[in-house]
Protein backbone atom coordinates (compact mmCIF):
# COMPACT_ATOMS: atom_id res chain seq x y z
CA UNK A 1 0.00 0.00 0.00
CA UNK A 2 2.86 2.34 0.82
CA UNK A 3 4.27 1.82 -2.70
CA UNK A 4 0.86 2.64 -4.16
CA UNK A 5 0.62 5.92 -2.18
CA UNK A 6 4.13 6.96 -3.29
CA UNK A 7 3.26 6.23 -6.92
CA UNK A 8 0.07 8.20 -6.57
CA UNK A 9 1.94 11.17 -5.06
CA UNK A 10 4.55 11.12 -7.85
CA UNK A 11 1.86 10.93 -10.53
CA UNK A 12 -0.06 13.77 -8.89
CA UNK A 13 3.07 15.92 -8.71
CA UNK A 14 3.86 15.32 -12.38
CA UNK A 15 0.28 16.19 -13.34
CA UNK A 16 0.40 19.38 -11.25
CA UNK A 17 3.68 20.45 -12.86
CA UNK A 18 2.34 19.74 -16.33
CA UNK A 19 -0.72 21.86 -15.61
CA UNK A 20 1.50 24.79 -14.56
CA UNK A 21 3.64 24.73 -17.68
CA UNK A 22 3.03 27.35 -20.31
CA UNK A 23 3.17 27.36 -24.04
CA UNK A 24 5.90 29.19 -25.89
CA UNK A 25 3.37 30.66 -28.30
CA UNK A 26 3.31 34.43 -27.99
CA UNK A 27 2.90 37.20 -30.53
CA UNK A 28 6.42 36.63 -31.83
CA UNK A 29 5.97 32.88 -31.85
CA UNK A 30 9.27 32.22 -30.13
CA UNK A 31 8.59 32.60 -26.42
CA UNK A 32 10.14 36.05 -26.15
CA UNK A 33 8.86 39.53 -26.90
CA UNK A 34 9.89 40.55 -30.38
CA UNK A 35 12.32 43.46 -30.55
CA UNK A 36 13.69 45.62 -33.34
CA UNK A 37 17.07 47.21 -32.82
CA UNK A 38 16.70 46.51 -29.10
CA UNK A 39 13.29 48.21 -28.84
CA UNK A 40 9.99 46.46 -28.20
CA UNK A 41 7.05 47.21 -30.46
CA UNK A 42 5.31 49.00 -27.58
CA UNK A 43 8.38 51.15 -26.97
CA UNK A 44 8.62 52.08 -30.65
CA UNK A 45 4.96 53.00 -30.81
CA UNK A 46 4.71 54.86 -27.50
CA UNK A 47 8.08 55.95 -26.08
CA UNK A 48 10.54 56.23 -28.97
CA UNK A 49 8.29 57.65 -31.65
CA UNK A 50 9.45 61.27 -31.79
CA UNK A 51 12.30 62.94 -33.68
CA UNK A 52 13.22 66.45 -32.53
CA UNK A 53 14.68 69.17 -34.75
CA UNK A 54 16.67 72.36 -34.33
CA UNK A 55 15.21 75.80 -34.98
CA UNK A 56 14.15 76.12 -38.63
CA UNK A 57 15.73 72.69 -39.39
CA UNK A 58 14.45 69.49 -40.88
CA UNK A 59 17.60 67.37 -41.06
CA UNK A 60 17.74 64.15 -39.05
CA UNK A 61 20.62 64.19 -36.60
CA UNK A 62 22.71 61.17 -35.63
CA UNK A 63 21.02 60.72 -32.27
CA UNK A 64 17.86 59.49 -34.05
CA UNK A 65 19.47 57.03 -36.47
CA UNK A 66 19.25 54.00 -34.16
CA UNK A 67 15.60 54.67 -33.32
CA UNK A 68 14.61 55.24 -36.94
CA UNK A 69 16.52 52.11 -37.98
CA UNK A 70 14.46 50.16 -35.42
CA UNK A 71 11.25 51.65 -36.83
CA UNK A 72 12.36 50.65 -40.33
CA UNK A 73 13.11 47.10 -39.17
CA UNK A 74 9.68 46.86 -37.54
CA UNK A 75 7.87 48.21 -40.61
CA UNK A 76 9.83 45.90 -42.94
CA UNK A 77 9.12 42.84 -40.76
CA UNK A 78 5.43 43.56 -40.16
CA UNK A 79 3.33 43.42 -43.34
CA UNK A 80 0.24 45.06 -41.82
CA UNK A 81 2.10 47.92 -40.11
CA UNK A 82 1.68 51.45 -41.42
CA UNK A 83 2.81 54.74 -39.95
CA UNK A 84 1.73 58.35 -40.31
CA UNK A 85 4.61 60.78 -39.80
CA UNK A 86 3.25 63.99 -38.26
CA UNK A 87 5.38 67.10 -38.76
CA UNK A 88 5.17 69.86 -36.14
CA UNK A 89 6.79 73.23 -35.42
CA UNK A 90 6.99 75.74 -32.62
CA UNK A 91 4.81 78.85 -32.75
CA UNK A 92 7.39 81.16 -34.30
CA UNK A 93 6.86 82.00 -37.95
CA UNK A 94 3.73 82.41 -40.03
CA UNK A 95 1.17 79.61 -40.11
CA UNK A 96 1.92 79.03 -43.81
CA UNK A 97 5.66 78.80 -43.21
CA UNK A 98 5.16 76.43 -40.28
CA UNK A 99 2.89 74.11 -42.28
CA UNK A 100 5.59 73.89 -44.96
CA UNK A 101 8.37 73.34 -42.39
CA UNK A 102 6.33 70.67 -40.61
CA UNK A 103 5.85 68.92 -43.95
CA UNK A 104 9.60 69.02 -44.65
CA UNK A 105 10.20 67.40 -41.24
CA UNK A 106 7.65 64.68 -41.92
CA UNK A 107 9.10 64.13 -45.40
CA UNK A 108 12.64 63.88 -43.97
CA UNK A 109 11.59 61.05 -41.64
CA UNK A 110 9.60 59.36 -44.41
CA UNK A 111 12.59 59.62 -46.75
CA UNK A 112 14.90 58.10 -44.15
CA UNK A 113 12.57 55.15 -43.61
CA UNK A 114 12.10 54.66 -47.37
CA UNK A 115 15.88 54.69 -47.73
CA UNK A 116 15.96 51.75 -45.30
CA UNK A 117 13.67 49.75 -47.57
CA UNK A 118 10.27 50.56 -46.10
CA UNK A 119 7.58 50.42 -48.79
CA UNK A 120 6.32 53.94 -49.55
CA UNK A 121 2.75 52.61 -49.34
CA UNK A 122 3.27 52.05 -45.60
CA UNK A 123 4.36 55.65 -45.01
CA UNK A 124 2.03 58.63 -44.81
CA UNK A 125 2.80 62.23 -43.87
CA UNK A 126 0.88 65.21 -42.56
CA UNK A 127 1.94 68.61 -41.26
CA UNK A 128 0.24 70.25 -38.33
CA UNK A 129 2.63 73.19 -38.27
CA UNK A 130 2.18 74.96 -34.94
CA UNK A 131 -1.38 73.69 -34.38
CA UNK A 132 -0.61 70.70 -32.11
CA UNK A 133 2.03 71.75 -29.58
CA UNK A 134 3.38 69.04 -27.31
CA UNK A 135 4.19 71.64 -24.67
CA UNK A 136 2.50 74.98 -24.08
CA UNK A 137 4.84 77.90 -23.46
CA UNK A 138 6.66 80.77 -25.04
CA UNK A 139 10.28 79.90 -24.27
CA UNK A 140 13.01 77.71 -25.73
CA UNK A 141 12.16 74.82 -23.37
CA UNK A 142 8.68 74.62 -24.90
CA UNK A 143 9.80 75.43 -28.44
CA UNK A 144 12.38 72.62 -28.46
CA UNK A 145 9.71 70.03 -27.59
CA UNK A 146 7.36 71.30 -30.29
CA UNK A 147 9.87 71.10 -33.18
CA UNK A 148 9.28 67.44 -33.92
CA UNK A 149 8.03 64.66 -36.14
CA UNK A 150 5.90 61.97 -34.50
CA UNK A 151 5.57 58.44 -35.87
CA UNK A 152 1.92 57.54 -35.26
CA UNK A 153 0.99 53.88 -35.78
UniProtKB/Swiss-Prot annotation:
Cell cycle among keywords: yes
Compartment annotation: Cell outer membrane
Any Pfam family the entry gives: OmpA
Residue ranges of the region described as Peptidoglycan binding: 55-56, 97-101
GO biological process: cell division
Keywords linked to the UniProt accession: Cell cycle, Cell division, Cell outer membrane, Lipoprotein, Membrane, Palmitate, Signal
Protein topology in the membrane: Lipid-anchor
GO annotation, cellular component aspect: cell outer membrane
InterPro entries in alphabetical order: Bact_OuterMem_StrucFunc, OMP_bac, OmpA-like, OMPA-like_CS, OmpA-like_sf, Pal, Pal_lipo_C
Superkingdom as given in the UniProt entry: Bacteria
Lipid attachment, kind S-diacylglycerol cysteine: 20
UniProt keyword Lipoprotein, yes or no: yes
Lipid attachment residues per UniProt (N-palmitoyl cysteine): 20
Quaternary structure note: The Tol-Pal system is composed of five core proteins: the inner membrane proteins TolA, TolQ and TolR, the periplasmic protein TolB and the outer membrane protein Pal. They form a network linking the inner and outer membranes and the peptidoglycan layer.
Family membership noted in the UniProt record: Belongs to the Pal lipoprotein family.
Protein role: Part of the Tol-Pal system, which plays a role in outer membrane invagination during cell division and is important for maintaining outer membrane integrity.
Entry protein name: Peptidoglycan-associated lipoprotein
Gene that encodes the chain: pal
